[in-house]
Amino acid sequence: ECGLNYEDNTFRYRQDSTFLYYFGPKRDGLVGVIDVDNDKELLIGNDIDIDDIVWYGSVDSVHDMAEHAGVKESAPMKQLQVICDNAMKEKRTIHFLPPYRHDTMIQIFDLLGIHPSKQREAASVELIKAVVKMRSTKEQQEIEEIERACAIGYKMHTTAMRVTKPGVTEKYVGGQVNGIANSYGAMVSFPTIFSQHGEIMHGNPSMAVLESGRLALCDCGGETMEHYCSDNTRTFPVNGKFTQRQLEIYSIVEDCHDLALKISKPGVKYFDVHMDVCRLMTDRLKELGLMMGDTE
């Protein structure tokens, strides 16, 4: 956890997705070790003390969390340094994924002596590829969880469309959208983007008042209790009706979306789908006089 404005008032903690995939526990202060050479896994972390129990209540021990995840061994955090030291003495390769949290970077520096500025380039490409290969194939339970996330996202977007009207603020709509995610016991996949300024890539909701004749862009998604996410973007008129020009441009986006669905299939490269969509979009924008030149 990380302090928001002082140590005990923290940002909401969200467990790392790859850690969740392989080990499961959502609590902070844990490290997962996969020892391929010795064919064993360990869940490492310290049990919470009485001060934490007063605030959060009784929670599972690290041993119990490991057992629940099917991990046979657990150890306190101090053991992690011993494991790393022994591996380095034996000249074994220690693989880790690119860190993105500063406390993790400091921990890697303490354990392995790799400066935070060098850690991304020192991260294991072999491990990255192995994780990507495994996580790219979804089992049925995962597919159901993704569909659950999409259903939450659908409710978020339709709520945005319903409450958007001239005179309300972007903040109001954004708050209503976020409330949908929270009400399903979930959270937003990322900070909700809702703005009349669609040209700004990450336009967070402001106190700007929505105006008739403008377009509102909503980019949001929900994250389930099991941390699978949805992410959709929709653009719609503030007053509920497109102008002719807006409709012409919007229809291009709709046709590009339909083309992507039509040509996407096993064996087709994502890049090829992307380029075919770009060609269609460019040709249609040229027809409207909004682009010029050779499509290719």
Where are these regions (language model features)?
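Active-site neighborhoods and metal-handling regions in enzymes and metal-associated proteins
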Residues: 1-296
